[in-house]
Amino acid sequence: MKLRIDKYLADMGTGSRSDVKAFIRKGMVKINGTAARTGKEKVDTDCDIVLMNDEPVEYVQYEYYLINKPAGVISATEDRNTPTVVDMIKEAKKDVFPVGRLDKDTEGLLLITNDGLLAHNLLAPKKHVDKKYYVETDGLLNEDNVRQVLQGLKVDEDFTALPAFLEIIESGNDYSKCYITLHEGKFHQIK
């Protein structure tokens, strides 16, 4: 892929386009050993060697991060008042976003990327990608609950969830631990 050198360097997190142009004016940027002059030079991301301050800057089109989202962090790209999952990734170079959502008080594995096609293929209902959750509950779950979830639970008067799979892995008098596999992801469906 061919890009202008200013876009290439801005995409890789070296600074804004205006910052990059200042670096170029100072002679800090080289393409295949030759100093860039204008910021408009084209770079082939597959074969050209770009140096900034004599350090290589490799072009990475897509970024992928798996994070363990802690409780108290929201599944968003930005928020003025609350830390986000994107805030947790200091080394991200491009506009990354969470694939899916976990509630603020929920913790768990979350994919962060800038690969829109992958996100679409994982989230689009027509793609039928299951989502599996580990859940700890107050109260005892039993085989009746397993059957109810398998038939599709009525979440509220306007919505009945698609059939899902509930696997109880441990239960006591006042708690249960289980896995639930959903075929769709609706607001607070697991709660």
Across the structure, where does each feature detected by a protein language model lie?
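Basic, flexible Lys/Arg- and Gly-enriched helix-loop patches that mediate nucleic-acid binding at interfaces
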Residues: K2-K191
